[in-house]
Swiss-Prot record:
Cellular localisation: Cell membrane
Protein's name according to its UniProt entry: Chitin synthase 8
SUPFAM superfamilies: Nucleotide-diphospho-sugar transferases (SSF53448)
Keyword terms of this UniProt record: Cell membrane, Cell wall biogenesis/degradation, Glycoprotein, Glycosyltransferase, Membrane, Transferase, Transmembrane, Transmembrane helix
Glycan attachment points: N78, N215, N304, N473, N545, N691
Presence of the UniProt keyword Metal-binding in the record: no
Alphabetized CDD domains for the sequence: Chitin_synth_C
Free-text function comment from the UniProt entry: Polymerizes chitin, a structural polymer of the cell wall and septum, by transferring the sugar moiety of UDP-GlcNAc to the non-reducing end of the growing chitin polymer.
Comp. bias regions, Pro residues: 1-11, 26-41
Listed Polar residues bias regions: 65-78, 98-107, 143-160
Source organism of the structure: Cryptococcus neoformans var. grubii serotype A (strain H99 / ATCC 208821 / CBS 10515 / FGSC 9487) (Filobasidiella neoformans var. grubii)
GO molecular function: chitin synthase activity
PANTHER family the record matches: CHITIN SYNTHASE, CHITIN SYNTHASE 1
């Protein structure tokens, strides 16, 4: 099964959500005791336009809806409870009476003729589309042509559905308080997979005019390729989403709209798709009451709807929309607005003004408001449903784990009410359609609800809120959960424009965070799956130590089933790199109290620690400066620095004025993520990492004085000074890594030359090959994209891997030769061993470095990466220097954010505006009259008729910025290569053919590396001791 798959359709339904012919109305059990029949109101009855005698569309009603003696008594329904049948349902039941409330006819018929109230789940509004008489499947219409009003037009209309419902609906009321009533323990058993859906259930609020603004235009979930596995029916009826039996609407939807048959003057339907014959009988002679008209639309289709007047909620367009009954019937809790309605808010302001402009979220509307302890954000761009389901499953497991901690003062069975999951999609037109379908299947998104413009203001974000009760299993299958499933409060923010991840975080922190005021914020990327209890361990670090302002866990490479992914050397090398970083680097920095980077893919922050002070200065202000680093006035240093904006946030948090926050590493928390498995992906990813980390490290070193404005103790400040020296030394080594590696290669090959002249015939060609590969990398990096030069980059990495194998052979050969020389001189002693330069400078230093790797891995009880990934890392490590570093510095000018031309306001969703006499009301404006359509068309022709202005070619600001960045790139690259070349020349040529200086330098270099490894080992050991007593 692919992620996103839903459980098989319930009994009596096909794969598209439609009831089968053989079981259109299956007998239902008696889940409730029988009650008396509801009183029957005067009702209307329509004739059948599909009959052979029909000459026109439905018109005047016949006031006779009572059951006839010839009709068997079927099911009747309790109007107060839409899901409660009163008596068994037969294949043909009596008509469900309509309310007596009448409205003015939409087509200008005499007002004296009463019209039935509109069907509340999205009935068509055109004059040809009279109201649904009832949810049952057989609807009778008046077939007498004499009943047609004089002005009735029998030709199909090609305009938008018309009609205006003047009833004013109030905004969504304050949600009822559920904190004390609903709990996990009171949730009944989940709905079994084989439950029978009754296709004749009337929808909630049937005949209730107060909800018509929602139900007349019930959203249609339209996709390029609707997938029945998500529970998305392929019906083109807007009502088929929530009421399976309420899809038998007859309306003129306009030319070519969804392929629905249109009615001609003789009462027959134009068979647009060959599904019907126009007389109510299908091609096979069977009754067509459940026939689907039209193919799957390849675009977002237009819905039949009525112009509505909707009162604004606190000045904003806020809608509460019924969720589909197909979804609700799979949920154990079916009462309460948070479970039965999805809340939509059209946000027209900047994220920083969200609270100031009086926008709010559901959690603040309860009485008392719900307190949010954990606020989890999942940022995504265009990732597919597989990655999203993986992340969402991990989050659901963690929330379920929190609800099982019955002894906790914070969590327990109602712990899900203290967690809000926020999903931020970067661009409405960029989101993956299948991921959007997953969100719709969970209930937190519905197509066709959003608007582009509200009262002249462009919508910046579409916010959907819903508490889902569905779950995602290990295979990515969506459906009812088991006994461990708990509700999940979900907040889906669909940004109108693509403005990158840092803008998504601004929505999370400055808009939603400012509204909910959470305690701990957890950051996740789509594709990263936290462990089943990892989020709890992250939260526990904040709960134990009040001075912890940020924390992170271990990032684990996805190994696949039976660790098959480790067969790829790229994945294995990254697995070793991640493991050693989590064993040595992160524990060391955690002991210091300052972790240079909390990965944005899996980290957590205390919300109050990130807030700015009264003057507006603080971590969040500096963090979001990076969002403006794509303008023409941005400097290249700042632009590259904010490629690693999470490093900036960490430094600003530790050095916050008059505070003493520290960062902590939580070994018990882990998250699994995909790592690049191809060379182009790895090269592109590391370019951003290397450039961002390098310039961010320079920023923290240059602004180290900020530390003195904090309230850290003298001891903590001294320890941070030690870490400053350590980080500076690491940065110097990273800068000269290119030259140092070549020196190591030269020393090893020259040492072999001293053992015999035959080695020269191998070493001299290898030197030329090394230089040629390096130059090849420079040429590729300056003019070729990794994705477009996959063979070139891959061949370079393979070439450096072969050179590394030769260097390993040389090191082992020299080690053995050194031991033989010492043994030949006499007894093997320590002084004799250290007296041999080659053995002392090369072998011992390398053994010390990698020996510490093995010891620290054993102490951490994680030795397996040394067995499965160590050798692959040794082969790929030279490419980290000679390929990845070269590409990063050659493209230091590439800081584009990809948002050029994104200032255009889309209008494909439509706009709403306030009425002239009441600013608190908005109406949906649709072109109806043919003259309006012609006027728009004439305006377009006039634009084409005008002569185009002469184009004047000028150099744009973007071009000037690009030229400036390229010049800086050239200068940085020149300085980097010249300094590394000067180092090589000084070390190799200063002694005039004698290799003693090069050998000595090599020994100092290797012992320095061993010393740094030992320093990291001490920090890792200290962390393990502290963790032992901290109770993590």
């Amino acid at each position: 099964m692919r992620p996103g798959d839903i459980y098989p359709p319930p009994q009596g339904y096909n794969a598209y959500g439609s009831p089968t012919r053989q079981n259109q109305r299956p007998p239902q059990p008696q889940p409730y005791p029988p009650q008396p029949y509801p009183p029957q109101q005067p009702a209307v009855q329509y004739g059948d336009p599909f009959s052979a005698s029909s000459q026109g569309p439905p018109t005047a009603p016949l006031h006779n809806m009572s059951p006839t003696p010839q009709e068997p008594q079927g099911s009747r329904y309790n109007a107060s409870h839409p899901l409660q049948p009163i008596s068994p349902s037969g294949p043909q039941g009596p008509r469900y009476s309509l309310p007596t409330q009448s409205l003015s006819p939409f087509n200008g018929s005499p007002a004296s003729a009463p019209a039935p109230a509109p069907y509340t789940m999205g009935s068509p509004s055109h004059s040809n589309a009279r109201m649904h008489a009832s949810p049952p499947q057989h609807i009778r219409f008046d077939t007498n042509p004499s009943h047609l009003p004089p002005q009735q037009q029998l030709t199909p209309s090609y305009s938008y559905p018309s009609g205006l419902d003047d009833r004013l609906t109030s905004p969504p009321p304050l949600l009822p308080h559920h904190s004390s009533q609903s709990s996990v323990s009171s949730i009944p058993a989940p709905v079994p997979d084989n439950i029978n859906y009754n296709p004749s259930y009337p929808p909630q609020g049937y005949g209730n005019a107060a909800d018509d603004d929602m139900n007349d235009s019930h959203p249609l979930l339209a996709h390029a390729a609707p997938d029945a596995r998500f529970g998305i029916p392929q019906s083109t009826s807007a009502m088929s989403m929530s009421a399976p039996a309420a899809r038998y609407q007859l309306s003129d939807t306009g030319a070519g709209d969804m392929g629905v048959s249109m009615y001609t003057g003789n009462g027959n339907a134009e068979g647009q798709n060959g599904f019907g014959t126009g007389d109510g009988v299908g091609a096979n002679g069977e009754d067509e009451v459940n026939m689907h008209y039209g193919p799957i639309p390849a675009r977002m289709v237009r819905r039949n709807r009525t112009q509505k007047r909707v009162q604004l909620f606190q000045g904003h367009l806020v809608l509460d929309i019924e969720v589909p009954t197909m979804l609700l019937d799979q949920c154990p809790i079916r009462q309460g607005n948070e479970f039965t309605k999805m809340r939509y808010t059209a946000v027209t302001c900047d994220p920083n003004d969200f609270v100031e402009d009086r926008y709010t979220l559901r959690q603040r509307l309860y009485d008392p408001p719900r307190q949010t302890e954990l606020f989890i954000v999942i940022t995504m761009y265009n990732e597919d449903d597989v990655l999203f389901c993986r992340t969402m499953r991990g989050v659901m497991q963690n929330i379920a784990h929190l609800c099982t901690r019955s002894k906790s003062k914070t969590w327990g069975e109602n712990g899900w009410k203290k967690v809000v999951v926020c999903i931020v999609a970067d661009g409405r037109k960029k989101i993956n359609p299948r991921t959007r379908s997953v969100l719709a299947a969970l209930g937190v998104y519905q197509e066709g609800v959003g608007k582009n413009i509200i009262n002249g203001k462009p919508v910046t974000a579409h916010v959907y809120e819903y508490t889902t009760q569905l779950s995602i299993n290990s295979s990515g299958k969506i459906g009812p959960g088991g006994s461990n499933t708990v509700p999940i409060q979900m907040l889906f923010c669909l940004k109108e424009k693509n403005q990158k991840k840092i803008n998504s975080h601004r929505w999370f922190f400055n808009a939603f965070g400012a509204c909910l005021r959470p305690n701990v914020c957890v950051l996740l990327d789509v594709g990263t799956q936290p462990g089943p209890d990892s989020i709890y361990h992250l939260w526990k670090a904040f709960d134990i130590n009040s001075s912890v302002g940020g924390a992170c866990g271990e990032i684990v490479a996805l190994k696949g089933m039976f660790w098959k992914n480790l067969l790829n050397p790229l994945v294995a090398a990254q697995n070793f790199e991640y493991k050693m970083s989590n064993i040595l680097d992160k524990p060391l920095e955690s002991v210091f109290g300052y972790i240079t980077v909390l990965p944005g893919a899996f980290s957590a922050y205390r919300y109050i620690a990130l807030l700015n002070d009264e003057k507006g200065n603080g971590p969040l202000k500096q963090y979001f400066v990076g969002e403006r680093m794509h303008g023409s006035g941005a400097g290249i240093f700042s632009s590259n620095m904010y490629l690693a904006e999470d490093r900036i946030l960490c430094w600003e948090l530790v050095s916050k004025r008059e505070c003493k926050w520290k960062l902590h590493y939580v070994k018990s928390a882990y998250a699994i993520t995909d790592v690049p498995d191809t060379v182009p992906e790895l090269v592109s990813q590391r370019r951003r990492w290397l450039n961002g980390s390098f310039f961010a490290a320079i920023h923290s070193i240059v602004h180290f004085g900020y530390l003195y404005r904090s309230s850290h103790t003298f001891t903590r400040k001294f320890i941070l000074h030690v870490e400053l020296v350590y980080q500076t030394l690491n940065m110097v080594f990273a800068w000269f890594a290119l030259g140092n590696y070549y020196i190591a290669f030269f020393v090893l090959t020259q040492s072999l030359n001293s053992l015999g002249s035959a080695w020269k015939y191998v070493n001299i060609p290898l030197h030329y090959i090394y230089i040629a590969l390096l130059l090849w990398c420079f040429l590729l990096s300056l003019g070729n994209r990794p994705a477009g030069s996959k063979i070139g980059y891959t061949s370079s990495m393979v070439g450096f891997a072969l050179i590394t194998i030769y260097m390993l052979f040389a090191a082992i050969f020299l080690a053995v030769k050194g031991i033989e020389d010492v043994q030949a001189e006499g007894e093997i002693t320590a002084s004799a061993v250290f007296g041999n330069k080659i053995f002392r400078n090369i072998v011992i230093s390398l053994l010390a470095t990698y020996g510490l790797y093995i010891i620290s891995s054993l102490m951490a009880l994680e030795p397996w990466h040394m067995i499965t990934s160590f050798f692959q890392y040794l082969l790929i490590a030279p490419s980290y220097i000679n390929v990845l570093n070269v590409y990063a510095f050659c493209n230091v000018h590439d800081v584009s954010w990809g948002t050029k031309g994104s200032d255009k306001v889309s209008d494909d969703l439509g706009a709403v505006k306030s009425s002239a006499d009441n600013k608190d009301e908005v109406t949906v404006d649709l072109p109806i009259e043919q003259k309006d359509i012609n006027a728009v068309y004439a305006a377009e022709l006039q634009i084409l008729g005008n002569k185009a202005p002469k184009e004047v070619r000028v150099v744009s600001d973007d071009q000037k910025q690009e030229d400036y960045y390229k010049n800086v790139r050239t200068n940085v690259l020149l300085v980097w290569t010249m300094t590394n070349g000067a180092l090589v020349a000084v070390i190799l040529q200063a002694s005039g053919g004698d290799n003693s200086l090069a050998t000595t330098y090599m020994g100092v270099l290797l012992y320095t590396v061993a010393g740094l490894a030992f320093f990291r080992f001490l920090g890792s050991s200290t962390y393990l001791v502290v963790r032992l007593f901290a109770g993590e």
